[in-house]
């Protein structure tokens, strides 16, 4: 079914805003055009699905600002044969975007409700290359390591050691670093033969990366 004129206009403005804020990779823009953010926003916030702003979701979490999703995805430099680990499933929006750019996405969240709802959306949208798991994201997913790319959508005080260890040589991790009650710095980590290189990308604000499992 085609969108009504108002929704179509909002989606067009949404994509224009992404470009204005620095999302220029054609593959990333195409993926974000194909994955409708409106599918991942519910309740009172549905009419803001195409605004460039973070929005609340259940379990005290948020769906990230679209331009930040685009810039993080762009910084990850995902290739079509890559195996990607995402820490922090949340609404499932970021994993859905990544799934159009790579071979396989593993996404972990500490909240069972969020994983169940995201899995239902992935099935509804026909995205079979995403595996969503309930777990402690700070520990990564060692049984599937190493990963070509790792995306962390929650802030850690430092890049988590277990995640660095699960990054393939030649791989890239994008992670927000800093205190949870302050503005954080988004960094890109590249793993080389002799260690890790770090690039600061921009200031961001994310919910904290919490160890253990949630109550819901």
Swiss-Prot record:
UniProt KW Methyltransferase keyword: yes
GO annotations of cellular component type: cytoplasm
UniProt similarity note: Belongs to the methyltransferase superfamily. L-isoaspartyl/D-aspartyl protein methyltransferase family.
Annotated NCBIfam families: pimt, PRK00312.1
Residues the record marks as active site: 64
Gene3D superfamilies: Vaccinia Virus protein VP39
Pfam families to which the protein is assigned, alphabetical: PCMT
Species assigned in the record: Paracoccus denitrificans (strain Pd 1222)
Catalytic activity: [protein]-L-isoaspartate + S-adenosyl-L-methionine = [protein]-L-isoaspartate alpha-methyl ester + S-adenosyl-L-homocysteine
Main location: cytoplasm
TM regions (residue ranges): none
Location(s) in or outside the cell: Cytoplasm
Annotated protein name in UniProt: Protein-L-isoaspartate O-methyltransferase
One GO BP: methylation
Keywords, alphabetical: Cytoplasm, Methyltransferase, S-adenosyl-L-methionine, Transferase
The protein's Enzyme Commission number: 2.1.1.77
Function field: Catalyzes the methyl esterification of L-isoaspartyl residues in peptides and proteins that result from spontaneous decomposition of normal L-aspartyl and L-asparaginyl residues. It plays a role in the repair and/or degradation of damaged proteins.
Gene Ontology molecular functions: protein-L-isoaspartate (D-aspartate) O-methyltransferase activity
């Amino acid at each position: 079914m085609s969108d009504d004129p108002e929704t179509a206009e909002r989606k067009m403005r949404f994509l224009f805003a992404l470009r204005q804020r620095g999302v220029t990779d054609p593959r990333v823009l195409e993926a974000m055009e194909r994955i409708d953010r409106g599918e991942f926003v519910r309740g009172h916030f549905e009419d803001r699905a195409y605004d460039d702003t973070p929005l609340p979701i259940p379990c005290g979490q948020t769906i990230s600002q679209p331009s930040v999703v685009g810039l993080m995805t762009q910084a990850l430099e995902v290739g079509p044969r890559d195996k990607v680990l995402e820490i922090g499933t949340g609404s499932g929006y970021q994993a859905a975007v990544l799934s159009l750019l790579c071979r396989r996405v593993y996404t972990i969240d500490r909240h069972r409700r969020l994983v169940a709802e995201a899995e239902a959306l992935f099935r509804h949208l026909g995205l079979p290359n995403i595996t969503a798991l309930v777990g402690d994201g700070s520990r990564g997913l060692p049984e599937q390591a190493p990963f070509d790319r790792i995306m962390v959508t929650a802030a850690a005080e430092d890049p988590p050691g277990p995640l660095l260890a699960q990054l393939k040589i030649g791989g890239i991790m994008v992670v927000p670093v800093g205190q949870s009650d302050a503005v954080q710095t988004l960094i890109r980590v590249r793993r080389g033969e002799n260690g890790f290189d770090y690039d600061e990308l921009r200031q961001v604000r994310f919910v904290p990366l919490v160890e253990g499992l949630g109550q819901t």
